[in-house]
Amino acid sequence: MLTFQNLVFKVFIVIQPLKDNIFKLIYKIKYFNQKYIESCCEIVEKILEFKQSTGSLIFLYFKVQGKNFGSKERKLITDVVFSIVKNKSYFQSLIKEEQLNISNLSELRCLVILGVTSKLGKEIIYPFLSNIEKNFLSRIEMKTISSIYKEFSHSLLLNEKLSVPSWIFSDWISQRNLKKTINFIESNHSDFPIYCRVNILKRKVKDVMVKIRDSGFTFERSGLIEECLKFSPGENVNRIKSLFAVGVIEIQDLGSQLIAKLVVPKRHQIIVDFCAGTGGKSLALGMHMKNTGKVISIDISSERIVKLKKRVSTSGLKNIWPIVIKNLEDERLIKYFGTADSVLVDAPCSGLGTLRRNPDLKWRVTESEITNFSKNQLKILTKASSLCKIGGYLVYATCSTIYEENEMVVEKFLSNNVNFDRCCTNSVLEKQNIVLDKSWNVFDSYGNIHLWSDLTDTDSFFMSRFIRTK
């Protein structure tokens, strides 16, 4: 029998999505105006020079112009700019098809029009366009990645329509297959979560969760690493900057936290973080070692080490020993030869596993640069391995999805260094109660780990672990 309460509930279920869409439309109309188009044009023009990352250019723009925009307005502009960078060659192909009809329009202006349309819809931007721009937009039919795949699956233009350089596209397909590659590309266009690591030396995870929940955040605790919190896409974690300021939490991708776990840090060990950067993994290692032993954080950049020291000071850790080296032959490395229980090499790489956050990288990185990265990675891994004691462990990781930076480096290293053998990464993690979803299929037949963002909802990472036998 249909009660009054059930009737009200059913009506609510029907009306609620419509109501939400109306509110979203009102929100877009309220905050969008001509200055957004101009701002997007300014930012995208700089980005297309490919001298700096998308994120850093947006940050610099708002640093100067920030007083003119509220947080909601900045988010709208950021979303549009990222859409343009992610879809660059697809948008350019649409513009090219209409070239004869838009001879008086700049490509930059057209890119921004398409970017706004892709994120906010035609109805939002239409009132701010000239007649020729309206005619251009009226002839454009935006397609989803899946529909592009169906239409161009047998075309040489597929990678262009999907906005991926051909050499990257070919590499991904050779590693996985076309269908999985399409899924991966689609995931790089979607909104993504933010992961944080709780510093359990300062605060219990449950206490931090209460504090964050009281601040109105939507988040969940990772089922893999108990110190890891996953915030929903769009959450502004800067609203809890008080927790960051005192070192209670750090932004760190789940994949990055898994790398630290693959090292298996233990109390009183000596662990070398060979490419420490600003110290994200050094901090995680030091925490897991309960502030005992030594984490020797090595980097070639004094600027990065300065930032690392600041983070160490905030974290409360006393077991981090930062060292700046001039090059791989620096004499300061000699004293550590054959002493480390574990050595982590999170090698400098193309960063193509971070395309969700850094979409410009696919346009900035070249094939020749990949070759240079690969050669340098092998040199770094080889030198770092000399710091590992007999019976000690070596972990190699990148945030790249390119074969030449990952498996190829590992194969060359093992062929040149017969005193190192592979480890079973699956069992290493399972012994720490970290059981990765079997459907992710992250372990290859050699024991390497591949995290692909379409499956794991993390940045994409490659990891491998070895033991020094003699």
Positions of predicted regions on the chain:
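S-adenosylmethionine
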Residues: 4-470
